A protein has these predicted regions:
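Glycoside hydrolase catalytic-domain context in secreted enzymes
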Residues: 1-652, 662-676, 681
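Short proline/glycine-enriched turn/loop segments at secondary-structure junctions
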Residues: 656-658
């Protein structure tokens, strides 16, 4: 690739650093394009010097564009095609937030593997996934694309996702670097303000997991860090990403984010933005063309920029080589990929991604006479946001899988036939957010369950029938007032193509729910942001001291904490033990716990191991998830589950941003059990 680089003119090099949509080559391919892409100010010559394409609908379209491009390419450097395969291509997996509920990286790997096959078969070589932004504010619309509020879970699942893509040859781009999930007030594109210590301690872990898994690209975020937009932030892109995280791949702007630095008022114009971008370490420009239009003149004044440009172009060429495009620019081998197993993978992942939050009478027997009410009784569009080629027309509605005596998809009580409802034994109310109420640019100020639903639940009380609510949502919602009106509560964050079958199978007990919440459900909106791994404070809450951490009008406690989730099985945890109570870094303890299924129902459960550093040189969380394992238990079976502690489980960043381990006491938590050990030098 270095020899090829030497042959390129400056204009050709800058073309390799520019991404445009396919309609620039084939006019008929102009689909769902908006904003900056519609006016990139490129002439005919420039169009055929660009190096990458944003979005493609099929492998045939890819071939069509590639053929036209290569016919006019001086060096026969193929285009590379990228797009957003977030949770599946044609077969839609659960959303990332739903996947995180499974606490099963093996299934998530398989889901990414299946998605990769379908994406490659559709003409893509790169997916803009995973979104590894740590999230703590459910008002933000993009929490549905995340793996939740825990840094360690984010690390593990980001890594599993990338490895799944990689196993099939699909390249991945982790996003959004960095700390995009901390947008103030939960508003998309808003300001982010955090310290370097906070960045290193919590917010980098997801990106680190993706990079450790082999991510090929990193996308910058729309926000600022230390008052400098991430897209032109040299500290983030060169010091943190390249030096600290050892990333060697391609960096890319988010959609038009380079030119958006003008709106941040940190760049004077296109050319100032281009100069700052290349200096900061931004390789590839998406949806704008300031590199191509501005840098030739800028280089005349500062030839040292040529070195930075060459480094960026070489990385892009190596990316194309990695994708196999130089050997076969049409990647014909991808057409024959076997995707017949995708639906089974989606079902298995969705089964473990549904969460049971309240249970008084589930599962139901098949002979139970059911009234199935609510819009999701017959809704086919249950795929969730970012569902790419997923077709809701071929998706089953819930009424197909639940044997209901009475079905009404209205959400108006007056539309119901109470005589028919009263002839049934149980009400299933399938309600919640629509797919378009979460995702990019879909933030909410109010995440309470709709008052309309509360009134509906209150009126349904007059039937005296047990009520199961199935909540379809893209975020945690406030369910405090609704909970007393509900007998059983199943929640999922959009389960994809097999949603209806999984919901029905769970209600009937064919599937025993084993999901756990990857995000905390607040009791009240005023608690936001609320997350389990909060720092200890100087005045922790005390019932006997009024001058401590509390609200006057609501409890400090969430409605449902991170990691909460019920099962039809009854699991008991006992005999939490350590192999040693005094340890050194060379001989850290093994933690063991006995888990017993005390019920007559086989089930799976995730054992979550938390650690608290009892004393440290900087404030530390009240507890942190450090390891987890998922096991299956037959009725009345017991298993001893072991965790070997590592140095990383005990480490943290100090004020100098050095990762250290300090001697002292550590507390281990598993469910309601605790134990302690001391680390000595």
């Amino acid at each position: 690739m270095k020899e090829l680089l030497k042959k390129l003119t400056l204009e050709e090099k800058l073309g390799q650093l520019t991404m445009i949509p396919p309609f620039f080559y084939i006019k008929d391919l102009k689909k769902e394009v908006f904003g900056a892409l519609t006016d990139m100010k490129l002439n005919e010559k420039s169009i055929f010097q660009t190096g990458s394409v944003l979005g493609i609908q099929s492998h045939q379209e890819m071939i069509q564009v590639q053929e036209k491009y290569l016919a006019r390419s001086r060096h026969q450097i193929p285009l590379i095609f990228m797009g957003d395969v977030i949770h599946g291509a044609h077969t839609i997996m659960p959303t990332p937030l739903a996947q995180a509920s499974s606490f099963n990286p093996n299934l998530i790997y398989k889901g990414a593997e299946a998605a990769a096959k379908e994406a490659l078969k559709s003409g893509l070589q790169v997916t803009f996934s995973p979104m590894s932004d740590l999230v703590r504010d459910p008002r933000w619309g993009r929490v549905v694309e995340s793996y939740g509020e825990d840094p360690y879970l984010n690390y593990v699942l980001s890594k599993a996702t990338v490895k799944g893509y990689k196993s099939q040859g699909l390249l991945s781009c982790v996003k959004h670097f960095a700390a995009y999930g901390l947008s103030e007030a939960g508003q998309d594109y808003n300001t982010v303000d955090l310290s370097r210590l906070n960045l290193f301690q919590y917010y980098l872990e997801g990106y680190r997991g993706a990079i450790d898994g082999g991510a090929d690209m990193v996308m910058t975020s729309f926000n600022t860090f230390e008052y400098v937009p991430a897209t032109t932030n040299k500290y983030l892109l060169r010091d943190v990403l390249r030096k600290k995280l050892k990333f060697k791949g391609v960096t890319i702007s988010d959609y038009d984010s380079l030119l958006q630095t003008i709106y941040h008022r940190t760049s004077q114009d296109d050319c100032d933005a281009a100069l700052k971008g290349i200096k900061a370490g931004l390789d590839l420009e998406m949806a704008s063309s300031s590199y191509m239009r501005c840098l030739p003149d800028v280089v005349k004044k500062d030839e040292e920029l040529l070195k930075l440009i060459d480094e960026a172009v070489l990385r892009v060429l190596q990316l194309k080589e990695k994708a196999g495009l130089f050997k076969d620019p049409y990647l014909i081998k991808h057409v024959s990929l076997d995707t017949s197993n995708s639906m089974k993978v989606a079902y298995n992942l969705a089964k473990e991604s549904i969460v049971l939050l309240k249970n008084n009478s589930l599962p139901l027997k098949k002979k139970t006479k059911i009234s199935l009410l609510g819009k999701y009784a017959t809704e086919k569009h249950v795929l969730g946001p970012w569902s790419w080629h997923g077709d809701p027309k071929v998706t089953d509605e819930l009424s197909k899988h639940l044997k209901a005596y009475y079905i009404n998809d209205s959400e108006c009580f007056d539309d119901y036939d109470l005589d028919k409802i009263n002839q049934t034994d149980h009400i299933i109310l399938a309600i919640g957010e629509r797919y378009y109420e979460s995702g990019e640019a879909h933030s909410k100020a109010d995440i309470n369950l709709s008052p309309h639903y509360l009134k509906l639940l209150e009126k349904l009380q007059q039937t005296n029938l047990p009520i199961t609510v199935v909540l379809y949502t893209g975020r945690p919602q406030i369910l405090t007032e609704a909970l007393p009106l509900i007998d059983n509560l199943l929640v999922h964050f959009h389960l994809g193509s097999t949603t209806s079958k999984v919901v029905a199978d769970t209600i009937y007990g064919i599937n025993n729910p084993c999901g756990r919440l990857p995000m905390t459900f607040p009791r009240h909106q005023g608690q936001i942001p609320i997350y389990y791994n909060r720092l200890s404070t100087g005045r922790p809450y005390s019932e006997t001291n009024p001058y401590t951490l509390k609200y006057l009008d609501v409890s400090n406690e969430p409605l449902f904490e991170f990691g909460y989730g019920l099962s039809y099985s009854k699991f008991n945890y006992s005999n939490l033990k350590l192999s040693t109570n005094v340890a050194t870094l060379k001989s850290l303890p093994t933690v063991s716990v006995t888990v017993t299924n005390e019920s007559d129902v086989s089930g799976k459960t995730s054992i979550l191991l938390y650690i608290k550093d009892d004393f440290a040189s900087v404030a530390r969380p009240v507890k942190e998830l450090k390891q987890f394992k998922k096991i299956s238990l037959k009725p009345h079976e017991s298993k001893v589950v072991e965790f070997k502690l590592t140095k990383n489980d005990l480490s943290f960043y100090n004020q100098d941003l050095k990762k250290i381990v300090e001697p002292g006491g550590f507390t281990i938590f598993i469910e309601n059990l605790t134990t302690k050990f001391t680390l000595v030098k």
